[in-house]
């Protein structure tokens, strides 16, 4: 690991079923290396900080490197999501995405903000692929932010986005991707989100 990575854990112990588990996991991960720092904040008491990091639900983990890359995990990153979470910490620390050069160039062409939400479950073997791509896109481009959300912990979002299977990716509240897709297809959908809604609706 090259640079320090901060894991900002937002919790609300009294009303959040899995906040304690998420907080303990962040503590354990922060003990793996002196380059990983775990910080815990109360979603209500520290609401200004939560708003500053665009945290709107808990448990939430913001992963911060040299700067805030807009990468968030909502839930407890266990199961198949654990490896993708750890890989992302390493990528942030080393500022490495391992994306194809063509993908990097396409990300450089983005001119409008892109919000990627990847809905996952911990028992889904393909979800970590979609999550990993979203993480890396956000790390590569300042205009991309990525939320990975364990839909089993936020069932109201499952209803809102009509999630029947995972992974399901929602880009800018308009474009939906069902399943894990290759890097080239993923970036194509991201670029599509740059067009006016009338073009892709």
What are these regions (language model features)?
Residues 1-33, 106-142:
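Local sequence-structure signature of Cys/Sec-based thiol-disulfide redox active-site neighborhoods
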Residues 15-19, 46-48, 126, 154-157:
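Short, charged/polar "capping" segments at the starts of alpha-helices
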Residues 21-77, 96, 110:
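N-terminal non-catalytic structural scaffold regions of very large proteins
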Residues 34-46, 141-158:
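Thiol-based oxidoreductase modules, predominantly thioredoxin-like and allied folds used
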Residues 50, 129, 158-161, 169:
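Compositionally biased, intrinsically disordered or flexible polar/acidic segments
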Residues 56-57, 164-166:
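Short, hinge-like loop/turn segments at secondary-structure boundaries
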Residues 62-96, 165, 170-201:
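Non-catalytic, surface beta->alpha helical segment in thiol-disulfide oxidoreductase systems
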Residues 102:
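Phosphate-interacting basic helix/loop segments used at nucleotide- and nucleic-acid interfaces
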